[in-house]
């Protein structure tokens, strides 16, 4: 048996090129008997940190690959910073405008309009074309109550900051000069000391994060960097690998004998999002995550209709169509892996952030 390693460089979302192998070689395996453990070794190549993914492949005595594993070389923030460095610069400046009911951030032909009464995104346009991301961010698995909001310019970037009471402290929206819209959400910040009457979280916590509305009728597929190509559950993540994946839209319901079954299933939770492009001839959209370990929920799969009545096999999905989640539920099973999470805020906690960027440009 033998193993080999590869350092892979992945293309950015706007390029459909295949991944590039920057370096590869053999892994030095220890001489061990079945059931024993040992340490494998290989030397890092000079170009190691120029890559995005480390891939390990195992081969049997016949030379057939029997298993492979992938590991990210860069965390989400470093990957996104490098992506931004590759983008063309602009001398333009973002701006904002307001009326009695709304706030609008504007840059490079992209406009994002928010409701003054609750801080929610209500409409996005690229030129005259409406991108149907709206009605969010709605809280998932937690409570948050709109408190206040303010607008400002920071250099060439327009910033809309929304303050909340409850489990969420604030969401900062940034319109960059090139038209990218950033969302920086701070949650579980005990230091904020916002007074909120009631329970901060759902009990139990099955999903935890934020949701938006986005109709699926015009979506033709999805291309993404993260774990794939399959959807996941909290206790069904093993077996997925880091990489750039592509799948066409389908409504496969496993167990429905009268449907054409197309795999991988399109709808569901996707692990460790770096970026994802929802493909559409009319309203494409790409989202990037600067935060490690975010689950991307894409629409809501149907339950089997003709199964025996033995209870629902999966937990209820969040409201909305697209969700960005710190936590997802497990598929029903025995053992601790199927248990819901428990969240506790301790005195002095600074909270943690979810940082996303939305690209509505063609």
Placement of each model-derived feature along the sequence:
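Beta-strand/loop-rich accessory regions of lumenal/periplasmic or secreted enzymes
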Residues: 47-49, 78-362
């Amino acid at each position: 048996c033998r193993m080999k390693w590869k350092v892979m460089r992945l293309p950015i979302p706007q390029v459909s090129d295949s991944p590039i192998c920057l370096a590869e070689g053999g892994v030095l395996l220890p001489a061990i008997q079945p059931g024993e453990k040992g340490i494998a070794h290989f030397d890092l190549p000079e170009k190691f940190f120029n890559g995005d993914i480390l891939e390990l492949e195992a081969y049997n005595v016949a030379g057939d690959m029997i298993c492979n594993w992938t590991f990210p070389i860069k965390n989400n923030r470093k990957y996104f910073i490098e992506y931004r460095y590759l983008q063309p610069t602009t001398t333009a400046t973002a701006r904002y405008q307001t009326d009695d009911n709304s706030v609008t951030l504007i840059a490079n032909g992209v406009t994002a309009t928010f409701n003054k009464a609750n801080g929610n995104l209500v409409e996005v346009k690229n030129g005259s074309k409406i991108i149907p991301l709206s009605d969010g961010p709605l809280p998932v698995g937690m409570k948050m109550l709109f408190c206040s909001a303010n607008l400002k310019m920071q250099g060439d970037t327009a910033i809309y900051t929304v303050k909340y009471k409850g489990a969420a402290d604030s969401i900062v929206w940034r319109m960059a000069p090139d038209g990218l819209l950033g969302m920086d959400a701070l949650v579980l910040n005990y230091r904020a000391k916002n007074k909120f009457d009631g329970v901060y979280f759902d009990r139990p916590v099955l999903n935890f994060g934020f949701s938006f509305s986005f109709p699926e009728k015009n979506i033709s597929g999805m291309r993404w960097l993260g774990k794939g190509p399959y959807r996941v559950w909290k206790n069904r993540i093993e077996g997925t690998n880091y990489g750039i994946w592509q799948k066409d839209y389908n409504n496969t319901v496993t167990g429905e004998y009268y449907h054409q079954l197309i795999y991988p299933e399109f709808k569901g939770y996707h692990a460790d999002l770096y970026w994802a492009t929802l493909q559409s001839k009319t309203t494409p959209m790409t989202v990037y995550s600067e935060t490690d370990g975010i689950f991307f929920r894409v629409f809501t799969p149907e339950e089997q209709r003709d199964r025996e009545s033995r209870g629902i096999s999966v937990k209820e999905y969040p409201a909305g169509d697209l969700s960005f989640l710190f936590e997802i539920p497990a598929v029903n099973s025995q053992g601790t892996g199927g248990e819901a999470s428990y969240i506790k805020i301790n005195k002095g906690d600074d909270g943690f952030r979810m940082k996303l960027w939305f690209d509505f440009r063609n």
